[in-house]
Structure formats: structure tokens, C-alpha cells
Amino acid sequence: MGLLAVSRDSGDTLLACRAGDRFIPGSNQKLYTLGAFLLEEGPAARSATRVAARGKVKRSRRPDGTTEVALRGDLVLHPCGMPDIVPLLAPGSRGLLDSLAALLWTGGLRRFEGTLWIDRGLFADEAPPPGWAHDDFGYSFGAPLNPLLANGNAVLVTAREEGGRVSLSFEPSGSSLDLRDAGILVGPPGESGWLIPRWIFGTRTLELTGLVPRGGTVRRGVAVSDPDSAAAAWFLAALRREGVDVKKAAVAMLPAGRGSGGRGEKPRNRPPATGTIAFGDPPAVEGWSAV
């Protein structure tokens, strides 16, 4: 156990016990973290996740007076560092990404062809700290955080037995996840099934062992190893669900920051982007800039 208590008035250390060590957070850690945030920022604190657009824009006027926008160029997703923790209400849904896609549709976006950039400059790109239980990495509750998603950094794996063979699938689809059967047995009908996930570090391969009853199905929530690329894939999927025609879309990552004080260094090689659209207000068509 480690503990550090600091006076908010003077800044003096009141109590320190292994204060410099890093530990696996307890399940009640969120209470202290949330309490500290509310004390510092207040319950009315808000921060904006932004989408910026750069490229060639074609506008067309519809008979009903609305304007439709076709963008050929870049979309840049700038997270604010407040990950989405809303309930996942539907298969494949990701609350924040779904909301952004809906705002873009409301603003007139009907077609996108180009590159989706994910700004990774806010959080440090570092491995889990020493002492973290490796067995937790594969499970959904052990999923890594990124500035966009918290409980959304996971997928639901389904193992289904048919004809003596076990097939594996996951939802939502789109993330670059490679599932590998590392020893899933077929048990008698009606037997309780189970799955144990294990990541192959340095890859996007997830090995699964377990047991599936004959003719049955077993499901398990598992973590994604690269939440940034997964968020990009799910954002494009959310755009498609809204009705945006996504053509030949590529995904690119801006460099990760150092995460100093929660404010990572500015990422280098940032593509120039204009027409910033703030999350929270429907993006106006005039917010798109043609270059």
C-alpha cells in the first residue's frame, strides 16, 4: 500500500508512505480520483473533444434548403482527455464517437474520402507499470485507457461450437484484432463454459483457452491492445451508421505525448487543420474550409 497526503492550502506533505511507488489501482481508486477532480475543477467543468477538417470541400444545396458537404482530405480527432464512460447502449455503440458522428451528420457531412488522424499527444505512450498483473491485460476490466475511451476499449468475443469445431468472432468489428484458438475444448452439452484471454505482447493477437459446451456459446469481454486505432475504426463505423458515405478512408496516428501533468507535449508533424468543430455544438457548414 502507498499513501501521499498533501495540504491543499500550504502544499506541505502531511503523510507519505511509499509515495513514489506505483501500484495496481484498487477498485475504490475512482472515488478518490473523482473527488480530487471535483475539488479542483468543480462539477460544472467541461472540456471539448474537437474534430478538425482540412481538404477540398464540395457543397451542394438541396431543395429543402439544407446544405450537404463532401470532404476529400483530412479529419483530425483531438481528444480532450476526458474518456467516454457512458453505457454502451447498442451493439457496436461508443457514446462519444457516436455523438461526434451525429454532430458531423447534422452539420451536413455526407461523404468523406481521405485520412482520419488521431491526435495521441495528450497521453503518454508507456507500458503498464512494474508489478501490474499480466493476467489482467486480456480482460475488458484491464483494458488500457486512451484520451477517448474508457469502458469502450474492449470487445465482446463469442466462441460458438458447431459440428465439433469452435469458431471465434467479436463485436464491434473493425478493430485490428487477431483471435487465436490456443486450446478451446468442447465439453458435454449443458456444461458451464469459460474463456481465458491472453495477449501476445507486441502484437494484436489474442490467444484464448477455455471450454465451450457442445452446441453452445460462450462470451467474454476482452481488452483491445491498441485503443487509438480501435477508436479510429469505430469512429469511421459510427459515421457510416449515421449515413456518411466513407470512401477509401485511411487512419494515421499523430505521435504520443509525454503525458506530463496530464498535458502531453505537442505532437510533431501535425497536419495543418482549419475549421475546428467543437463537440457540444452542431458544426456549422461554414466551419469547413476548402484549401
Report residues per predicted region:
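A short, well-structured edge-of-sheet supersecondary motif
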Residues: M1-C17, V251
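Short glycine-rich, polar/acidic loop-and-turn segments at beta strand-coil junctions
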Residues: S7-D9, S27, L38-E41, G81
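Short active-site loop at a secondary-structure junction
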Residues: A16-A36
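Conserved serine DD-peptidase/penicillin-binding transpeptidase domain
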Residues: L39-V291
